């Protein structure tokens, strides 16, 4: 029994260790992971990946390889020093479901920012013009400059849950079902900044952690307890009348 416990104690940390951990605190963007793409449009500043892009372009991005599994978790922190919009926002492309045999390609991504001040989880099929919004939530934090931590989970190739950090705890903001193919073994994780000419710089990412295991389930929003229905008043207790005792007469 002791040997079994020792083996489990050794294996559990290995199972829980993330497959990708990017702190963005090295000398180069590629110090910890093999990022490719528009590397010349980003710099590392005090532990943040920060955009320094070309104003004539509408978007820049970097990407790194990722292995897919049935159950996954993505966690990351982003910052924008301005109010995001439809033109100026951040996307993290988390899963590219490339089913080549069927000619299907679905790009799943989290978008932080829109004209409606929302965070969304979207699915964009290559053959369609517009993405499908799977989860959408308006957040007060998106009314101005943004610093936000986000968590996304995938369960059994199908169930997606999106969380944001509020007051020190991850809170569920939405769930959906959208099945991905088990035959797709991996793809590219892509961090993308979309911008107008006046908002080229100061998109930033602090860290990205991706695991094949879902951490302890974050707390869900508090729901007000339904008031208990008042109990019906008990019927008054009726005592039997005592019979008058008559004196015995001879």
What are these regions (language model features)?
Residues 4-13:
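Sec-dependent N-terminal signal peptides
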Residues 24, 76, 143-177:
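Carbohydrate-binding surfaces in secreted/extracellular proteins
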Residues 27-55:
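Extracellular glycan-recognition surfaces and repeat-rich motifs
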Residues 52-120:
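Secretory/extracellular carbohydrate-interaction modules
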Residues 125-149:
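Short, aromatic/His-centered strand-loop micro-motif at the edge of beta-sheets
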Residues 173-202:
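Flexible glycan-contacting loops in extracellular carbohydrate-active proteins
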Residues 198-216:
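Exposed low-complexity, polar/acidic, P/S/T/G-rich flexible segments that act as propeptides
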């Amino acid at each position: 029994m002791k040997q079994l416990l020792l083996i489990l104690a050794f294996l559990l940390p290995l199972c829980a260790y993330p497959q990708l951990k990017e702190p963005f605190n090295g000398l180069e963007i590629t110090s910890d992971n093999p990022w490719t793409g528009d590397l010349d449009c980003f710099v590392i500043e005090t532990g943040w990946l920060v955009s320094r892009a070309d104003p004539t372009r509408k978007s820049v991005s970097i990407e790194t390889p990722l292995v897919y599994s049935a159950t996954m978790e993505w966690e990351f922190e982003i910052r924008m020093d301005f109010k995001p919009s439809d033109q100026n926002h951040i996307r993290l492309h988390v899963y590219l479901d490339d089913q080549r045999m069927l000619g299907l390609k679905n790009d799943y991504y989290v978008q932080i920012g829109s004209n409606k001040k929302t965070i969304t989880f979207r699915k964009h099929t290559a053959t369609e013009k517009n993405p499908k919004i799977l989860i959408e939530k308006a957040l007060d934090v998106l009314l101005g400059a943004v610093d936000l931590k986000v968590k996304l989970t995938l369960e059994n190739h199908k169930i997606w849950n999106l969380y944001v950090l509020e007051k020190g705890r991850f809170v569920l903001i939405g769930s959906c079902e959208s099945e991905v193919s088990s035959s797709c073994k991996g793809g590219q994780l892509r961090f993308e900044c979309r911008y107008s000419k006046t908002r080229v710089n100061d998109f930033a990412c602090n860290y990205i952690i991706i695991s094949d295991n879902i951490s302890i389930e974050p707390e869900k929003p508090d729901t007000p307890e339904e008031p208990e229905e008042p109990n019906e008043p008990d019927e008054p207790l009726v005592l039997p009348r005592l019979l008058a005792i008559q004196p015995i007469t001879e």
